Design a protein with these regions (language model features):
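A short acidic, helix-capping loop that chelates divalent metal ions and anchors anionic groups
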Residues: 3-6, 10, 118-121, 176
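Short, hinge-like loop/turn segments at secondary-structure boundaries
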Residues: 12-14, 52-56, 127, 186-187, ...
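Predominant activation on well-ordered alpha-helical scaffold segments within soluble catalytic domains
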Residues: 25, 136, 193-197
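Alpha-helical scaffold elements within enzyme catalytic domains, especially in hydrolases
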Residues: 26-27, 101-102, 175
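Acidic, Mg2+-coordinating phosphoryl-transfer loop and its flanking beta/alpha structural elements
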Residues: 135, 146-181, 185
């Protein structure tokens, strides 16, 4: 999603089609119970069944405490409600890797170890939903000539590959660093903010 910060108008959106329901059923049958992001009655929410949450999911939810998008539901069927656009699975690699292999060619999938919690994640999105695709559309809308990006995870790789310059924070995933123009200070050291302060007038 790309949203105008002032008007809160959605500028770019990519939703799953109804085939996502069969994906969710497949996850459930493999004892994987995700957090599902959707627009429900025109309001963004992320839904989950608390009793099905893994330790990693509970850690994530704790980090989002107070988030108005939080939507705890009581049944798996409720995870299918609304216009789904993003699925997050946080579970054991032996459960997630086969699902990544199964869906990586049909959807935009990111399989990675979270650099902050060391938990294994599988993210599933519509095929068109990537940072690089969103940036291409924004570049066209804004008539941008130069692209500088910052990142820390494997889901930033496609964005790094298309940028004029790309900067990975020191605590970034090692797979991302190999695509970086330069490695800057870590998130804990406010690396991005410090880089912008030093370079934004160039």
């Amino acid at each position: 999603f790309v949203i105008d910060n002032i008007t809160e108008k959605i500028l770019i959106a990519n939703y799953f089609d109804d085939s996502v329901h069969s994906v969710l059923e497949d996850l459930f049958s493999n004892n994987v119970y995700p957090i599902v992001y959707a627009y429900i009655d025109n309001v963004e929410k992320f839904s989950f069944v608390r009793k099905m949450c893994t330790e990693g999911m509970n850690m994530f939810l704790e980090s989002r405490k107070g988030d108005v998008r939080t939507n705890e539901v009581n049944s798996l069927s409720e995870l299918k409600e609304g216009n789904n656009f993003y699925i997050t699975c946080i579970d054991e690699p032996k459960k997630l890797m086969p699902l990544y292999d199964k869906y990586k060619d049909k959807y935009h999938c990111v399989y990675q170890t979270d650099i902050y919690t060391n938990e294994q994640w599988l993210e599933i999105m519509p095929l068109e939903a990537s940072k690089s695709n969103a940036i291409k559309q924004l570049q066209s809308m804004l008539n941008c000539e130069k692209l500088i990006v910052f990142g820390d995870g494997k889901n930033d790789i496609d964005m790094f590959q298309m940028a004029d310059k790309s900067y990975a924070v020191a605590n970034a995933h090692n797979d991302l660093k190999q695509f970086a123009t330069e490695v800057i200070l870590s998130n804990d050291e406010d690396g991005v903010a410090r880089w912008l302060e030093a370079n934004y007038k160039q």
